[in-house]
Amino acid sequence: MPVVSAQSDLEALSLTFVTEHAAPIERVWQHLVDPGLRAGWLAGGEIAPEAGGTVALQFHNATLSGDDDYAPPPKYAAYNGPMPMRGRVLACEPPHRLAFTWNEPEDGEGSREPSNVTIELSRDGDRVRLVLTHARLASRDGLLGVAGGWHAHLALLANRLEGRPVGGFWRLHTRLEAEYDRRLPR
């Protein structure tokens, strides 16, 4: 598994993942900001390159996997087809830091508070260290789904960067979410 470490703070409802990649920092950065490259491990769509800009991601998790994958669990059925996610860029400092709000409500969608995602890249010898923090999650259940999701997406990123087969997103997500559920206190 490419994740070096994963930590959660249930009181703050936040997650932090650390991964390392044998790739130039500029190449890892491109996989964060280029819609075509990002669509291969997370979601297509646009992320404006400046603070205050729009994030308009288009998830299509069914297209991330090879033929070995299976349908998502029933509670995630709506997430298998095209699914938009909107946010605002909080910081864009190429090639080191990208931060944005996650799941901002559209007009008329109520007043839920968005969560925040921060991705930081740094050189560590001949490797790149990626630290992803997702903060201000709404609940433990939400944290479990996000933990399984980010862990699986980061595994896909590592496979893309290293030229390995991507593997089954939903199979991995389902296994990881169950593992986080066992490990995180209730």
Segments from the language model and where they lie:
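Hydrophobic ligand-binding cavity/cleft-lining segments
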Residues: M1-A51
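Short coil-to-beta-strand transition motifs
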Residues: Y79-R86, P114
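A conserved amphipathic terminal alpha-helix motif
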Residues: A135-R186
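Short beta-edge strand/loop motif at the mouth of beta-sheet-based domains
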Residues: P35-P82, F169-R175
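Intrinsic-disorder/low-complexity, polar/charged segments enriched in Ser/Thr/Lys/Arg/Asp/Glu/Gln
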Residues: A12-V18, T54, P84, R97, ...
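A short, structured loop/turn motif at beta-sheet edges
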Residues: I25-E26, A48-A51, L90-H96, E120-R129
